[in-house]
Structure formats: C-alpha cells, structure tokens
Amino acid sequence: MIYSQSELLTLVEQAIVSNRWKREPEGLYAPIEYVLSLGGKRVRPSLVLMACNLFTDDLTEALKAGLAIEVFHNFTLLHDDIMDNADTRRGYATVHKRWNNNTAILSGDAMLIEAYKLLATVKSERFSEILKVFTTTADEVCKGQQYDMEFEKRNDVGLDEYMEMIRLKTAVLLACSLKIGALIGGASEADANTLYNCGINMGLSFQLRDDYLDAFGDPKVFGKNIGGDILCGKKCYLLLSALELAKGDTKSELDSLLALDNATHRDEKINGVIDIYRKLDVDKRCEAQVSAYLLKAMTNLDRLSVPAERLEPLKNLIKAMANRKK
C-alpha cells in the first residue's frame, strides 16, 4: 500500500493526540502539550513515514520514530524562541511569553528527553544505527544554531559558511528523518544513504526558498510582512550574495540602507535593499539555487532501487516545499 501525504499526516496527528503529556508536575508538561497542539506542517515525521513506505507497508515502528523527531524538532523551536525573544510561534504566544523563561528552558529540556524515550520504543534490528543517526543529527542542529547566533555579530560571513550553517541547522534533520525511516523499512545501506543525501538537498532548497520569500513573497500569501530579514540584519543568502556582488556606488548605497533606523525608515530600508537585490539579480541567483538543489534531491530519488510509483508521494512533497509560496 502506498500512503498519500494526507493519510500519513492523519497518522502523525493521531499519534501526537494519543501521546498526550498531561502529567505531573503540570508546570513541566503543560508547555509541552501546548507546543505540540499548535500544529505545523509535520514535515519531518511525514518524511520518516514516506521513507519507510518506500520499502514496506508496515509503518508501526516508523510512526514511533517520526513522533520522536517531531518532539525533538519542537524542542529546538521552543529554545530558539527564547534565544530570539520571539513573541509568537504559529500565531500563538511562545512558551516563554505565556509562562516564563525558566519554564520554557526546563520544558524544552524535558522535550529532548521525551524524544529519546520515544525513539527507544522503536523495535528494529538496526536500532543502534538509528540511534547513532539521531544523536549525530541532534548534535549538528545545536552546532548550526550556534553558528547562526555567531553570524549575527559578524560582518565577514561568506556564502560557503552560510550554506554550511543551514545544512546543520535545517537540512540534517530532514536527512535524518528520511534515513531513519528507510532503515526501519529495511532499506539497503546504499539506499538509506542516498535518501540522507536527498534530505540534505531538500533542506537546502527549502531554506533558500524561505530566504527568497522573505523578500519577494506575496505578503497576503506568505502570511507575514516581507523584509523581516532585512530589518533584523539576518545573514541570509540574498544579503550575503548582494554584499559579495555589490561594488562602487551600489556597495555604498547598500551599506547606507542597511544602516538606516528601522523605526523611522522601515519602508525605505526594505524597498531600497530589495531594489538592489533585483539590480544585482540576487533574486534570480537564489531561485536558481533553489532549483539546483531540488534537481539534486530528485536525482537522489531516481537512484533508489524502488518502484517509480512508490516515489511519487515523496517527490510531490519535495516539489511542494521547494516551490511553496508561504
């Protein structure tokens, strides 16, 4: 049986509901319950299930692993929100705003432990390999977050450094999801590694698309105002490309725009920087990279020893993520 994306999403949501964290002390677990109730795309557990379904119809153990990865992912978001001092997540108050910083830190710690407890319930002859992939990935995600924070204080960040940072912060968890699903499903080592590489390329394409949409997305579709990265001086692909390409008067103009005060020159700053992006064809450059990594991900899938029809749900998801409008 080949499961559709909607069928897999239903399985994931049912698993989350059945694993409610209504325990004592309530102050520790209520924030976990809250975070997991806020929804989201559930991309990572869906990838675990899709990868497993390439090789088997039995998704029982993959669902456990998918839930573990989703809990881990939300743990990273919870702690990211503290570091970013974010007010909202998915339209709702963040945990540290609804409760407080100490509660958010401790509940986040508990979520990380819960993720490992859930993973430990997976029955597989390849569990040691599954655990190794998960643990290595968790370590890499932390490294990616640290690099991201360090980049905020640096003015000499290069594109290669940025690509490595987003590989660690974003792409490796997607790759981990695919590989763990494949291992549970009985994939060969070669196929499992190919799916891991697919996840890396998928993740890079996803993050570059996110960078693009922040400046060139339709606010009505994107769901938020454009230019957020510009206002906060985030080292994204667009800005780093512009800083690399800008020369002479264009470089001076870009530097002047970036130095403008957000409160008094918000629109001038956003529109001016976006105009320079267009002048330097940074938007086209970013779109080309999104397409290039999408193609690499698709090429990875075509190398699998799997019937073509089983690949369709995964291919459709990857295309949708790379071409999304929000």
What feature does the model see in each segment?
Residues 1-16:
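N-terminal leader/targeting segments and the immediately adjacent pre-domain N-terminus
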Residues 7, 17, 21-251, 319:
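Mg2+-dependent prenyl diphosphate-binding active-site environment of isoprenoid biosynthetic enzymes
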Residues 12, 205, 297-300, 317, ...:
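Amphipathic alpha-helices that form helix-helix packing interfaces
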Residues 13, 17, 49, 175, ...:
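An amphipathic alpha-helix signature
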Residues 137-140, 201-202, 260-264, 279, ...:
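A short structural micro-motif
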Residues 239, 297, 314:
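Hydrophobic, well-ordered secondary-structure elements that form the walls
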Residues 251-301:
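Mobile late-domain/C-terminal helix-loop "cap" segments
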Residues 293, 305-326:
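Short, amphipathic C-terminal "tail helix"
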